[in-house]
């Protein structure tokens, strides 16, 4: 039974690498602090086979925590140095099949393409993305997408393989690209970058994208909001303050935003409904 105290506002961090070593010293305390601030749930995506078990264990050890399984584009070169790429996909398939009965398992991710890091072989990234999208289609799972400087090619493969549900995490595309993803049925994730006044394009997107297509995230320990020092780790307990900025950008109350984002997140990852209540 999932029991939570529902504050005036409640938030779901749709993307946090809560299994990262940065949290090892005070993980439980940090999550308690987040929950005290109204962050009642979080989704922890895997990045490669080496942390498939870890994200599952961390999710089960912390109330309100869920996980996704996938191979991150920034890890594909490491993976292929350790094993044949077909073996990696087979490991992911096996992990998904094992996780399907688990109510804490909610998505396939983090997957996608990265057009920023120079030494990531593009063809290898594409191969892993396509193979993982096939798994998402086969198992009817939403995808948590990494789209840094790669919105158009990711969209191409989503259309090719008929993927219509998921989240474009840390979205930073153009208005046209946002419209394309929204029309495909995807949700767009906004986080710490939104808090910088110089982030005019992201703020414009956050203001104009249909409210029902938005979710919120921290990407902790990365993408620190504006009030943190350079290099300082991000935490899920900063999510309510990020949400406050988003509410201001949208021109709506934090309560209305909270309700909308909760519903959006459950629509983006329907398996959450096995534990989280509707609002």
Residue ranges and their predicted role:
Residues 2-279:
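Mid-domain alpha/beta scaffold segments of enzyme catalytic cores
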């Amino acid at each position: 039974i999932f029991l939570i105290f529902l504050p005036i506002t409640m938030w779901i961090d749709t993307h946090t690498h809560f299994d990262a070593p940065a949290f090892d010293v005070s993980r439980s305390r940090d999550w308690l602090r987040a929950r005290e601030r109204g962050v009642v749930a979080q989704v922890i995506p895997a990045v490669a086979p080496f942390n498939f078990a870890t994200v599952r264990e961390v999710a089960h050890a912390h109330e309100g925590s869920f996980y996704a399984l996938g191979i991150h584009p920034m890890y594909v070169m490491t993976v292929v140095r350790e094993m044949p790429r077909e073996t990696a996909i087979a490991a992911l398939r096996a992990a998904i099949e094992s996780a399907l009965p688990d109510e804490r398992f909610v998505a396939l991710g983090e997957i996608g393409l990265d057009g920023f890091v120079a030494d990531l072989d593009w063809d290898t990234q594409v191969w892993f993305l396509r193979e993982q999208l096939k798994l998402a289609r086969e198992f009817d799972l939403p995808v948590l997408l990494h789209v840094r400087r790669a919105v158009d090619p990711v969209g191409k493969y989503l259309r090719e393989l008929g993927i219509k549900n998921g989240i474009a995490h840390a979205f930073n595309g153009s208005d046209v690209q946002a419209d394309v993803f929204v029309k495909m049925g995807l949700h767009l994730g906004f986080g710490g970058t939104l808090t910088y006044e110089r982030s005019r394009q992201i703020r414009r997107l956050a203001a104009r994208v249909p409210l029902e297509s938005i979710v919120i995230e921290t990407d902790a320990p990365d993408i620190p909001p504006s009030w943190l020092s350079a290099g300082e780790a991000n935490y899920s307990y900063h999510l309510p303050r990020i949400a406050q900025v988003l509410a201001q950008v949208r021109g709506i109350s934090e309560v209305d935003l909270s309700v909308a984002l909760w519903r959006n997140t459950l629509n983006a990852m329907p398996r959450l409904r096995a534990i989280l209540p509707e609002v």
